[in-house]
Regions:
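Conserved small/polar residues in nucleotide/adenosyl-binding loops
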Residues: 2-6, 219-224
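Active-site-facing alpha/beta catalytic cores
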Residues: 5-154, 175-191, 195-199, 205-208, ...
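Redox- and metal-dependent alpha/beta enzyme cores, enriched for Fe-S-associated oxidoreductases
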Residues: 157-160
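Alpha-helix termination/capping residues and helix-transition junctions
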Residues: 163, 202-203
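Short, structured loop/turn "capping" segments at alpha-beta junctions
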Residues: 165-168
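Conserved, mostly hydrophobic/aromatic
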Residues: 171
Length: 224
C-alpha cells in the first residue's frame, strides 16, 4: 500500500516528481547530480545533511555540509558533524535562538564516541564547524531576519564569550531572512557586505553568503 503525500519530499525520495517514489533511483539521482556539477564546473559541492545516513553516498565528492534549522538541535546530527572531515555549517533553529546554534557548534567541535551504521565510532571533533544565520519565525508565523549589522555584532560577541575554534558565520540570504522572497537576496547580500566593510570584527567573522537559486538539473536513469 502506497502512502500518498501532499508535498514533495525531495529527489532522494522521488527523483521524478511525475512518477512514484523510488529510493534506489533517488540515491542514484543525488549522486549523479553532485558528480555532474563536479565534472562540468570543476567545483566540489555542498549539501544539507537532512539524513546523516546519506553521507555514505556523497562524502567522497562533497566539500561542505549544512545542518538545517530543524535538525540543528538533534543530537545525532551534532555527533555526525563532529566526525565530518569538511566544514559543517549549523543553522540557527527556526526560533532564532543563537545560543542553541552555538551549543551545536560546541557539540560538533568536541570528540565523541557513538554508534553509527551499527559500528562504534570515535570522532575527534570538527574544528571547522561554524554558524549559519537564516532568520527566524515567531509564534505568529512571521519571519524575523537576523542578517542586520546588530545581529552580526551580537553573534560576534557571543562567539567571543566561548572558547570555539575558527569563529565563522555564513549568512543565508533566503529562508526567513528574505521571507522566501528570492529577489530580496540581492539587497540582503549587499547589506551584509556593507556590514563587513564597516566592522573589522564582522569582516573576520562572516566568511560568505548562502544564496538560493532555482537552477534545475534534469536526471535520467540512463545518464551515467
Amino acid at each position: 500500500q502506497m502512502c500518498i503525500r501532499d508535498s514533495y519530499m525531495g529527489m532522494i525520495h522521488q527523483p521524478d516528481p511525475e512518477k512514484k517514489p523510488d529510493m534506489l533511483e533517488g540515491i542514484l539521482a543525488i549522486r549523479h547530480m553532485h558528480m555532474r556539477v563536479l565534472q562540468e564546473t570543476g567545483f566540489s559541492t555542498a549539501d544539507e545533511m537532512l539524513y546523516p545516513e546519506n553521507l555514505r553516498y556523497l562524502s567522497d565528492i562533497m566539500s561542505y555540509i549544512a545542518v538545517g534549522a530543524r535538525s540543528v538541535e538533534n543530537q545525532f546530527h551534532r555527533l555526525v558533524a563532529s566526525g565530518c572531515d569538511v566544514p559543517v555549517g549549523l543553522k540557527n533553529p527556526t526560533s532564532g535562538d543563537l545560543t542553541v546554534m552555538l551549543n551545536s557548534v560546541v557539540a560538533a567541535q568536541v570528540p565523541h564516541d557513538f554508534i553509527f551504521r551499527g559500528w562504534e565510532v570515535q570522532c575527534p571533533g570538527n574544528p571547522l564547524s561554524h554558524t549559519i544565520l537564516r532568520g527566524a519565525v515567531n509564534k505568529h508565523g512571521q519571519t524575523i531576519p537576523n542578517y542586520h549589522y546588530e545581529d552580526l555584532r551580537l553573534l560576534y560577541e557571543l562567539y567571543m564569550k566561548r572558547n570555539l575554534k575558527n569563529p565563522a558565520c555564513i549568512v543565508d540570504t533566503n529562508h526567513s531572512n528574505s521571507g522566501k522572497q528570492y529577489m530580496e537576496q540581492i539587497r540582503i547580500a549587499k547589506e551584509v557586505l556593507h556590514s563587513r566593510r564597516h566592522s573589522d570584527d564582522i569582516k573576520n567573522l562572516v566568511k560568505g553568503l548562502m544564496i538560493e537559486s532555482y537552477i534545475c538539473l534534469l536526471y535520467t536513469s540512463d545518464a551515467a
